[in-house]
């Protein structure tokens, strides 16, 4: 056992951060190691002589970062070629506003397609749907699964805009 964690039972809940994300969070990772009384020299030794332990430390840190981020998520968006899914993550439920473009020639992931969408928003070629869903036992994991499927964290501008249209 190293530090605070028993690695015999460690299973990642989320996903390992990318190399770029680790580089961005370099100081936070140093602080994470320090909370476990692991010095820079000891970390170098662990990476060299116990790579499986180093991998597990990276996984634990990744999960801690994800947990913190997911607690803060209020809005998610997933844009595909013909659909727009906008999520508002409330305390006890997730609200969804979905928009579907019937015209298969329109691709919302392109500038031209999104401009068409904006100009034809109230036409019969665009369908609106809304729904609510209560979370499972693990609200953070519900959000993470949406991110894994391609949703991105946003400030909610699109959700708030379309919420006004849908409620009229």
Predicted regions, residues:
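Short coil/turn segments at secondary-structure boundaries
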Residues: 42-46, 77-82, 132-133, 158-163
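Long, charge-patterned amphipathic interaction tracts in eukaryotic proteins
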Residues: 54-112
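Generic structural signal of hydrophobic/aromatic residues within well-ordered alpha-helices
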Residues: 42-43, 61, 65, 69, ...
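Glycine-rich, aromatic-bearing surface loops/beta-hairpins
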Residues: 121-168
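Charge-rich, low-complexity intrinsically disordered segments
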Residues: 108-126
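N-terminal amphipathic/basic-hydrophobic helices that include classical n-h-c signal peptides
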Residues: 1-11
């Amino acid at each position: 056992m190293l530090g605070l964690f028993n690695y015999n039972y460690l299973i990642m809940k989320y996903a390992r951060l990318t190399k770029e994300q680790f580089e961005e969070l370099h100081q936070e990772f140093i602080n994470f190691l320090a909370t476990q009384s692991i010095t820079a020299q000891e970390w170098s030794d662990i990476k060299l002589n116990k790579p499986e332990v180093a991998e597990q430390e990276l996984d634990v840190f990744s999960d801690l970062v994800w947990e913190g981020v997911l607690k803060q998520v209020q809005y998610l968006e997933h844009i595909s070629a013909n659909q727009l899914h906008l999520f508002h993550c409330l305390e006890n439920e997730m609200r969804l506003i979905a928009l579907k473009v019937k015209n298969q020639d329109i691709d919302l992931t392109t500038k031209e397609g999104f401009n068409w969408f904006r100009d034809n928003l109230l036409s019969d070629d665009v369908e609106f749907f809304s729904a609510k869903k209560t979370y499972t036992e693990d609200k953070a994991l519900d959000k993470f699964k949406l991110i894994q499927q391609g949703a991105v964290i946003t400030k909610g501008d699109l959700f708030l805009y379309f919420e006004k249209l849908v409620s009229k």
